[in-house]
Amino acid sequence: MSLEPPNQSLRSHRQTANPHVMAAAVQKQKPYIQDSTHLQLPNVGDKDRERVGNMVKRRFSARIPGQGVPYDAAAAPSLPVGAGSMIDDAVAAGGVPVTKSKTMTSPAKAAPVASGASGMLLKEDLDAHTFVTQQLATSNAEEVDRFVSKLKSLKSRLVDEQREAMYTNYNSFLTVNKEILALNSEVKSLGQAVSNFNVAVSAMVEDALESTSSKSQESSQSSLALPDSSARNRNSMVMLENMWANELASLFKHVEGAVKYLPAIPGRHVVAESGAWYQLNAATWKPLRPVHMFLLNDHLLIAAKNRKKDNMQMQQTQTLVADQCWPLSDIEFLDLSVSRRGTHPVVPNAVSVVCGGVTCVYQTEKPAQHAKVVSAFKKVAGEGRKNDTNKTQQQIRLRESMTYYAARNPSLRGHKELLQGLSNSKGHSRSSSVDITGRTKNLREIDDLVNDLDVKIAHRRFAEATDIILENIKDDKESTDITQQVLDIKLHQRQDELVAHLIDDVATDTSNTAVTHALGLLVRLGHGDQARGVYLETRRNLIHKRTRQVELLGDIPGYIAQVAVTYFRLIRSTAEVFRKCYTDNHLASSIAEWAKSMVEEFVLLFARQLYGVKPDTQTYQQCVSITRQQAAQLSEVGLNLDYLLDYVLSPARASKA
């Protein structure tokens, strides 16, 4: 009796287990027609069926041992590639094992369809026949069905992506269309604004031309016959002064008594004039009389309108008579149309002039005239304050510079001619306008040069500042050029400031390069002696400071070694810097004397530390060896001071001498 194969279905198993059912099936079975492809099954007798049924019953009644059927594990086939990942995926999905109906295909067959099919199908040069042949060359029906399902899913996914891309492109198109429409509207509005701007500019030009022509007509009809503004040559100081003189002459001609208040002096001129004003009573705010305002660069003139009757022609004429005149520096001009926290009532188009406790109020019916007078007064007052401030500061600087240099240089105390010349050159600006390219220009250049020098000193660009001072300073006491004398005084002041900065750099413990640079500039400026003393004293203090930092912890040779290194190396570096900055041979004695004093200090320190130690001991000999080794470097800079060390290095020879 043969056993059924493992993959036999449950239905066939049940039919085999029931012999009666099996026999009935055999009886109902029609005999096969024998042809070329089928053979007729043999007939089974009753005995055979009974014998088979008994054998089947006996088989199912047998007890199967627990250890199972033994088999040879070595002959079992190997697991497919990727079986571990398949098992992990099944466990992760819920622990459901893979059933027999799900045929496990090898990764070699499934991988191209799963991973590479999408990319290959999207290529334009894809040969569908070749691709399908390669994919399904060794596939069974189930793999073909799986391949078809994947193609369908890929198609649906591509359709969805295409639809989504179409929607996205459509939305982008709508957005761009909206932006284009918005940009088009903005361009149209910008074009409209540009056209409006052009129209406004054209209108302004026309208004300016009309205003110019109307002003020229009004000036010809006004009481003051002022010259045409187009004929004024403001680029020439002489022409400008002539124009101002003509304006004053016209003012004196048409305003009676104006010459009494405003004598003709150079530089005085009319800034603005305005009619249609009324003087108000400061208590009742009622109009008193019509007035005419003339604002000059230094005065405010109020002219009253006086009516005269002509008996011959029986007509009344108006003439202007000077009524009030105040210096601008003595009055307080207030705009009553602006509130000032309750200090005065708000009166439209009105101004108030306060001088010496007397208040005069004036009002006009024309806002343009009010704005004209107020703006002109603010402009003149601002220029006046600026000029006064400049004059005051200039006088203070001049007085301080003269006092400073008179104190530092007694030879300048008797230069009264220089002070008088400076006073004359800094007098009224209108008196020196003819000499516009002469002395005034030189003083301006001096101020620019000094300002540039101050900037370089403030930025610590000392080399450039030194070059400027040496190029422009000329100590010629017999010179009659006032500007050169002023320049020399200011340059001497900046030179002292520069020297103070350089001396501070030398006195500070900085690098040898910075000290060498500062000493070189001081030598060029003529302060080499002062710099030499400061430098040598600074180096002496540095040696003492470094020596005090060395600690004596019982090791005498170690202490002497550190002190010797400090003394002799600093002496050597000081001598090197000194030789670079001071090349004159007669100054070599200064560094030699300084080095001698420092070596003597070291000898005293050596003797004090080794007091009581015999010269033939090892400690003493170690100190002598270290000192000789460090002192030998002084000969490299031309300093031979070995004779000063004989007292401690060779005490026996020193005692014999």
From Swiss-Prot:
GO terms for cellular component: exocyst; transport vesicle. One of its GO terms (biological process) is protein localization. The keyword Isomerase does not apply. It comes from the Eukaryota. Its main location: cytoplasm. The keyword Translocase does not apply. Residues 142-165 form a coiled coil. Gene3D superfamilies: Exo84p, C-terminal helical domain, Exo84p, N-terminal helical domain, Pleckstrin-homology domain (PH domain)/Phosphotyrosine-binding domain (PTB). Keywords: Coiled coil, Cytoplasmic vesicle, Exocytosis, Protein transport, Transport. It is found in: Cytoplasmic vesicle, Secretory vesicle. Involved in the secretory pathway as part of the exocyst complex which tethers secretory vesicles to the sites of exocytosis. Plays a role in both the assembly of the exocyst and the polarization of this complex to specific sites of the plasma membrane for exocytosis. Also involved in assembly of the spliceosome. Belongs to the EXO84 family. Component of the exocyst complex. This is Exocyst complex component EXO84. The gene is EXO84.
